[in-house]
Amino acid sequence: MRALGFIGIILSIFSSFAYASEAKLDTGNTAWMLVASALVVFMTVPGLALFYGGLDKSKSILNTIAMSFSAFAVVTLTWIFVGYSVAYGDDIFGFIGNPFQYVLGKGISGINSDTGYPALLDLMFQLTFATITTALISGSFVGRMKFSAWILFAILWSVFVYPPVAHWVWGGGFLANDGALDFAGGTVVHINAGIAGLVGALILGRRKDTSLIPNNVPLVALGAGILWFGWFGFNAGSALGANESAAWAMINTTVATSTAALAWMFTEWLHVGKPTVVGISSGIVAGLVAITPAAGFVNLIGSIFIGAIASVCAYFMVALVKPKFGYDDALDVFGIHGVRGIVGAVLTGVFADPNVGGTPGLLYGNPKQVLIQIEGVIATILYSAILTAVILLVLKAVVGLRVSEEEELELDSSLHGEKAYNL
């Protein structure tokens, strides 16, 4: 009996070790990350699709919406097959993750001990970032790109461009090791997409009619509102839990976005004499983009400055610089996402508050952080520009990129066999 009792004690000790090693489900974090993932899906379909659709011409609104919807569907599959592995697999020379590690969810199971939610949920949350980043690029291409070429571009770009940059910053790559700060995707999402959009606009060439006359301003405003709402999942969700960091990200997102909307409105009012709803909506997106890299790193004063500075810079890029140089970035993806992403990323290195995110920026005695941020900006610009150009030039040679001039006149009818408004 004594022997049995001794064995029981030994087994209970080992059993306690086993239970101690098992991560426990944090239901609060799990619930929040499920909601955050759904919010980012809502940003893309329908938020981005409606925002872009309202900005575009009536003859191609359906094509514009289809580009966002199809990008989400296509990238969902590329992400679970290879994208997640490249972004978050075991590091290879600081550049990519093991591309075979998590194919179709292989090896993703159990509870993440760091976050307390199922590891599979991270696959879903990060999927939403990959999908919206690819969809963002479509705004530069609308009005003249073959739909088949767009599908092929979305496949290739979501495999060869987005995942490596995500790995550099969030997957243990060289920028992460250097200490680059990007809370929710200033470099990974917005600079990456903005530069790809600019390169694509240059390679595709100008449309026959390059005027920006929105076909449905209320749709633009509705899309901007949905983007703002969904962005809470984007930024606050990047805290990876229901915690103080998420609260900082949410309030900073609100403050920067409000500041940016006002900055754009008053700048436009002074410049052209009237504040427009499209301008206010663009200012909203300006603030959302600019605060993305800084959301969990800066205090409220920092978020005000970031929102205002980025919005004014983006306004002059869209209103003055683009017309002067004549490139046809149809819906201002470079001006809205590229420029604001760059400004936001650099200013994160200026305003980062150690009392918020643990890392000091220039104003808190760490000027080196600005240089690290600039390193991330330059690396992303170069990589995105070169790889995007290669992908588009290959597609141009193999399948062609542009529709015919006749198809461009009535793009929805020629590519999709339908019209948005049957009046």
Swiss-Prot record:
Cited PROSITE patterns? AMMONIUM_TRANSP
Task: Decide whether keyword Transport is in the record.
Answer: yes
Q: Name one GO cellular component term.
A: plasma membrane
Q: Where in the cell is it found?
A: Cell membrane
- In terms of domain of life, where is this protein from? Bacteria
Q: Supply the alphabetized keyword list.
A: Ammonia transport, Cell membrane, Membrane, Signal, Transmembrane, Transmembrane helix, Transport
Question: How does this protein sit in the membrane?
Answer: Multi-pass membrane protein
Residues making up the signal peptide according to the UniProt record? 1-20
What GO biological process terms are annotated to this protein in UniProt?
A: ammonium transmembrane transport
Q: Which GO terms describe its molecular function?
A: ammonium channel activity
Q: Where are the transmembrane segments?
A: 31-51, 64-84, 123-143, 150-170, 183-203, 217-237, 246-266, 278-298, 301-321, 331-351, 374-394
Q: Per the record's keyword annotation, is Kinase included, yes or no? A: no
What is an example of a Pfam family matching this protein?
Answer: Ammonium_transp
User: What family classification does the UniProt entry report for this protein?
Assistant: Belongs to the ammonia transporter channel (TC 1.A.11.2) family.
Assembly and oligomerization: Homotrimer.
- Function field: Involved in the uptake of ammonium/ammonia (NH(4)(+)/NH(3)).
The molecule here is called: Ammonium transporter
Record the organism.
Answer: Aquifex aeolicus (strain VF5)
Q: Specify the taxonomic lineage.
A: Bacteria, Pseudomonadati, Aquificota, Aquificia, Aquificales
Whichever gene encodes this chain, its name is: amt
